[in-house]
Design a protein with these regions (language model features):
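Binding-cleft/active-site segments that stabilize strongly anionic ligands or cofactors
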Residues: 2-126, 134-145
Length: 146
């Protein structure tokens, strides 16, 4: 299947520390058992909150800053756009732009995914997974070039 191919393609990829932002207020993320957490793993991402108990835990700003993710990823509420885009000026990232010491902010590794692909569990989740892998591949390429 497509997910098996993505996993195989990223099996030896250098890991990327990721914060997946589900919601801003309250600040929510996913753990490793939630499908998006599993997709991060497929793509060689290391979810900075993988081990929290709730599937969709609430976290503090301070906890995210302390985790210092290399990439911050969220999904658009409106689908139908590009599968993913680098979007450091999106309102979803306003909180993080005030944290310039974070790697993700310093490097502008702030990404928005098409919510229709990643947030709605169905056949298109495979396209969402491909988008996540593309995002993390971009971070890896830029990180290696530094």
């Amino acid at each position: 299947t497509a997910l098996v191919r993505l996993r195989a393609a990223h099996a030896n990829a250098p890991p990327v520390r990721v914060f997946y932002q589900v919601w801003q207020q309250p600040l929510m993320t996913v753990n490793r058992r939630q499908i998006i957490g599993d997709i991060l793993d497929v793509c060689g991402g290391r979810n900075v909150f993988a081990d929290l108990a709730p599937l969709v835990p609430t976290v503090s700003t301070e906890a995210v800053v302390a985790a210092d993710p290399e990439a911050i990823v969220t999904a658009s509420e409106q689908g139908g756009g590009a599968a993913w885009r680098r979007d450091p000026d999106a309102s979803a990232f306003a909180l993080w732009r005030r944290q310039p010491r974070m790697v993700a902010v310093r490097c502008d590794w702030l990404y928005t995914l098409d919510g229709d692909l990643i947030s709605r569990q169905g056949p298109r989740i495979v396209d969402g997974a491909a988008a996540v892998c593309a995002v993390l591949d971009e971070v890896r390429r830029e990180r290696a070039a530094r």
